[in-house]
Amino acid sequence: MSQSKEDKIRSILEAKNIKSNFQNKENLSEFNEKKASKRAEDLLDVYYNTLSTADMEFPYWYNREYRKSDGDIPVVRRAKALKAAFSHMTPNIIPGEKIVMQKTRHYRGSFPMPWVSESFFVAQGEQMREEAKKLASNTADELTKFGSGGGNVTESFGNVVSIAGKFGMRKEEVPVLVKMAKEWVGKSVEDLGFHYEKMMPDYDLKENLMSTLICMFDSGYTLPQGREVINYFYPLNYGLDGIIEMAKECKKAVAGNASGDGLIGMDRLYFYEAVIQVIEGLQTWILNYAKHAKYLESIETDLEAKKEYSDLVEILEHIAHKQPRTFREALQLTYTIHIASVNEDAISGMSIGRFGQILYPWYEQDIEKGLITKEEVIELLELYRIKITCIDCFASAGVNGGVLSGNTFNTLSIGGLKEDGSTGANELEELLLEASMRCRTPQPSLTMLYDEKLPEDFLMKAAECTKLGSGYPAWVNNSNGTTFMMKQFADEGMTVEEARAFALGGCLETSPGCWKQLTLNGKTYSIAGGAGQSAGSGVHFIANPKILELVLMNGKDYRMNIQVFEPHNKPLDTYEEVIEVFKDYYKQAINVLERANNIELDIWRKFDTSIINSLLKPDCLDKGQHIGNMGYRYNATLNVETCGTVTMVNSFAALKKLVYDDKAFTIEEMKDAILNNFGFKDALEVGNYSMADQVKVDKTGKYDAIYKACLDAPKYGNNDLYADNILKNYEVWLSKVCEEAQSLYAKKMYPCQISVSTHGPQGAATLATPDGRLSGTTYSDGSVSAYAGTDKNGVYALFESATIWDQAVVQNSQMNLKLHPTTIKGQQGTKKLLDLTRSYLRKGGFHIQYNVVDSETLKDAQKNPDNYRQLMVRVAGFTQYWCELGKPIQDEVIARTEYEGV
């Protein structure tokens, strides 16, 4: 009798003396027929037993060719470097794989890009070298130190050095990394950015904002691409040979012709040459895998496995040149192109887009011809899920853990509408849901673009998937998304039809797309794909509660002893004065961060611009211009990201109520209580980052009254206009302020209101707040989720609070709910979940996502992480393995209000 997936994993873990527990057993039992294929289970086992590995092969060949081509046109020089790197990647095929290729020669991992950012490796170079020397004498016992981070290499062991708290690198590769990093000192995007940023007269303010974590990180060199939607149209419609031929013809037409533009018109020749160079590198990479598959076929003795290798050879040799003929070939090509895209740059959030609609032409024709069965399609999609989950993003420890939580945000959107306004749901999208229910991996996360035109059975299927506790699909209001597209991109020619092509880029960034006409075997299909720049580069995460803290502290950060803003020297005698100073500080922050980011991105586009993503997205090939020259159709995508909105709103409400309306306490008494953390230890000392289990040190009771009053003050999420109107006023103001900001492309910006994981580290950097939150504890998640435990009047009261403002005028908002599994048990429970979701979206909510798990399970998983290797939770726009999350985020998820009735 065959084992279930859970039994299989349990047996593997128990063989290592690890106990296994599974979330949502009651809901899982409803769908106990949902099992991944044996092949997918085996490959998932490989993933569970694989560590994230940093590899120097790609950067070595990139760097070598880049030096060799010194003096060439920058975009061509970069293309040659990418070509060399792809051409020399060592192929690695795991037994049983039907979808092959990966970021590096390792099953899971990534690589550093010192040409983008090298300071971390230079600064840590000596430490890493010393650690590499020391490791030679380490004993096997030190292996036991690792484990609680899942696949993260959080500590060095054996022959492996931990880098950025996530990746393991073989000690012999460390000197190569350090040497290469030193070569880029003063030349990297990061260093050049810093050099020119310092020419801003208010550069010190920018540095202070970064040092105090009011701003989380510089996006211009950390993650310059991503949080956008890829476009697979050109490879799928023309094949790689076809794109080369197109570029060659365009070269002939534009060589020496400025076409009325004496500046960038001449750049077209160099861009088309760069396209040819890069695609030739991709073709070599694919064909190297074909050669490797042919070799494996030659030594394989099992006839079935031998045939599988033979099939891989045929598929890879074909897609290296031509339009895919079958569903499997199309799936392999899109996956290959996706890996190529994320290998080009430091990228997180290169989202897949409307995948079920993109691959539908091949699915439809293969099914009609009897070339494939639905079960075979589901297995391929399961294997695809595992491969996407293997993608890692190399970034600093602060970005990887503090922002991304190790996630890469390859979001796949389902539902929505077609170009003509009819439902976008199709049978392949149902199979995507089925595959995600059988093979529960964090990637690709699913997002349902909810529209009233979508079929009920399709929506019920999605609700069933959500019930399993994997955190997806998240639900997004399709109407809100198209409204925002029309508002933000009207100046660039956005139409209603094209607005329907949007999808989610990254975890929750609404990203513009377009429709292209794909022809397969004489039949034409309209498919959507990305058509815009990064929808998540710009000002990266302003800590709203921290700005308020500095208002109260006269511009000074007492934790760091830094005078961040010029002292306002105002007595703050009125609530209006507090608001006035807050707005002034906030606008100062946006302004200086916007200009610094513009400099960083300008240097990036000049020296490290995208070629792969440029050739993929409209209208770069038509214009002959890369992303840096606004080759994309839509360029008004850069944003201002914020964090801790509800913590800020609750704090304003407490100040207004206690200090200014009721006059129960003076502003000085409030400041004193905040500076002394209401008589408690800092969360960093306690080691718990939610409000639970905090330790009181003041024995006099000096702060008891004000602390209780702050906790009892009006809170957002209870349909109480006292607090909710503060949110409304803030949102209206923020939208206008962001529109006044201007990106390097001279386009207006807009608010992006997601926390990802920044509410952990930014909360850790913030003193106590007037709402009663203690120093160092995590902020509220998302942007319209209630602060943990403060939503007392039920979920529908929370919905009323969240929709007090027009969520369609900004890029996004974020609502997280935690439901006990028994709340939505059975078919009626599924309907209840769908009705709950509908209720919020029909009221104008933009986004809602669910954790269907009980808090006791999470608490046990925190104590015994190795027992819950496959447990996943929804954080803030993304799903991640519990054991790969940092403790501040774990504490926040545990503390969220758990609804047992809806």
Curated annotation (Swiss-Prot):
Pinpoint the PFL domain residues: 38-774
What protein name is recorded for this chain? 4-hydroxyphenylacetate decarboxylase glycyl radical subunit
* Modifications after synthesis and translation: Requires the activating protein CsdA to generate the key active site glycyl radical that is involved in catalysis. Phosphorylated on serine. Phosphorylation may trigger the formation of the active heterooctamers and thereby regulates enzyme activity.
Q: Which top EC class is named for this enzyme in its record?
A: lyase
Q: Does this UniProt record's set of keywords contain Nucleotide-binding?
A: no
User: What subunit structure does UniProt give?
Assistant: Heterooctamer consisting of 4 large (HpdB) subunits and 4 small (HpdC) subunits, arranged as a tetramer of heterodimers. Also forms a catalytically inactive homodimer.
What the record says about family reads: Belongs to the glycyl radical enzyme (GRE) family. HPAD subfamily.
Which Enzyme Commission number(s) are on file for it? 4.1.1.83
Q: What is the lineage of its organism?
A: Bacteria, Bacillati, Bacillota, Clostridia, Peptostreptococcales
Q: Keywords for this entry?
A: Lyase, Organic radical, Phosphoprotein
**Which top-rank group of organisms is this from?**
Bacteria
Report the protein's function: Glycyl radical subunit of the HPA decarboxylase that decarboxylates phenylacetates with a hydroxyl group in the p-position. Active toward 4-hydroxyphenylacetate and 3,4-dihydroxyphenylacetate, forming 4-methylphenol and 4-methylcatechol, respectively. Is likely involved in the catabolism of aromatic amino acids such as tyrosine fermentation. 4-methylphenol (p-cresol) formation provides metabolic toxicity, which allows an active suppression of other microbes and may provide growth advantages for the producers in highly competitive environments.
Gene3D superfamilies, from UniProt? 3.20.70.20
One GO cellular component term of this record is: cytosol
Q: Does the keyword Phosphoprotein apply?
A: yes
Catalytic activity reads:
4-hydroxyphenylacetate + H(+) = 4-methylphenol + CO2; 3,4-dihydroxyphenylacetate + H(+) = 4-methylcatechol + CO2
Q: Which residues carry this modification: Glycine radical?
A: 877
Write out the residues that bind 4-hydroxyphenylacetate: 348, 507, 540, 641
- Extract the InterPro entries matched here: Gly_radical (IPR001150), GRE (IPR051215), PFL_dom (IPR004184)
